Curated annotation (Swiss-Prot):
Gene3D superfamilies: 3.40.1370.10. SUPFAM superfamilies: Ribosomal protein L4. This is Large ribosomal subunit protein uL4. One of the primary rRNA binding proteins, this protein initially binds near the 5'-end of the 23S rRNA. It is important during the early stages of 50S assembly. It makes multiple contacts with different domains of the 23S rRNA in the assembled 50S subunit and ribosome. Forms part of the polypeptide exit tunnel. GO terms for cellular component: ribonucleoprotein complex; ribosome.
Length: 230
């Protein structure tokens, strides 16, 4: 279900679900974070930079100067009828050096923080406008992890395949319950990024994580935090 927008207000509200299927109040999604313009070109640039930074860059080949041996001329300069050669480690020989091969390099790109933040706001806003952001009190009841219970609960929230679950770092019970579920990716609020948001069909926030994320943006001067209301 799409987020509800109050009349004459730019504040979106979504229901807070409990594992037993009940609704425990609502939570507000500030427009500054969840109703921002989605700049596709910007999101593409940020995701490209993020994926590039994840590349290891440890590939390396040897040029003719790096390959061992080849110091002696393989045969005399004249009189053989063959093309003159100075080293058996030249690129045209088996065992020779590699021409224009990959070398060690850093693929990371410098992306301004404001661009990264704007891209994330655009991605979150797109999901919010399409009713793909959900809030929950917790993933499982109690302190005992249960993958079965977490899977069933997520199934009541969405039937789409890729789900991004955002919970607090201290929620070990929730983390252990969903970490082995296929199609479910787990992050803490401070790890939210454009790539993972766009890759997911739906986002499931715990109330704690959502409030934490909004508060962090407030501290950065982006938005005003909103708390859960009954």
């Amino acid at each position: 279900m799409a987020a509800k927008v109050e009349n004459g207000s730019n504040i979106r509200k979504i229901d807070v679900k409990t594992p037993d299927g009940k609704v425990d109040g609502t939570i507000e999604l500030p427009a500054e974070l969840f109703d921002a313009p989605a700049n596709i070109a910007l999101m593409h640039q940020v995701v490209t930079a993020q994926r590039a930074a994840a590349r290891q860059g440890t590939h390396s080949t040897k040029t003719r100067g790096d390959v061992s041996g080849g110091g002696r001329k393989p045969y005399r300069q004249k009189g053989t009828g063959r093309a003159r050669q100075g080293s058996m480690r030249a690129p045209q020989f088996t065992g020779g050096g590699i021409v224009h091969g990959p070398k060690l390099r850093d693929y990371s790109q410098r992306t301004p923080k404001k661009m990264i933040a704007a891209a994330l706001r655009g991605a979150l806003s797109d999901r919010a406008r399409n009713g793909r952001i959900h809030a929950v009190t917790e993933l499982v009841v109690g302190k005992t992890p249960s993958t079965k219970s977490a899977k069933e609960f997520l199934g009541t929230l969405t039937d789409r395949k890729q789900v991004l679950v955002v919970i607090g770092r201290s929620d070990e019970t929730g983390a252990k319950s969903v970490r082995n579920l296929p199609g479910v990716h787990l992050l803490s609020p401070d790890q939210l990024n454009t790539y993972d948001v766009l890759r997911a069909d739906d986002l499931v926030f715990s109330v704690e994580a959502l409030n934490s994320y909004i508060a962090a943006q407030q501290a950065a001067g982006t938005s005003t935090p909103e708390k859960v209301s009954a």
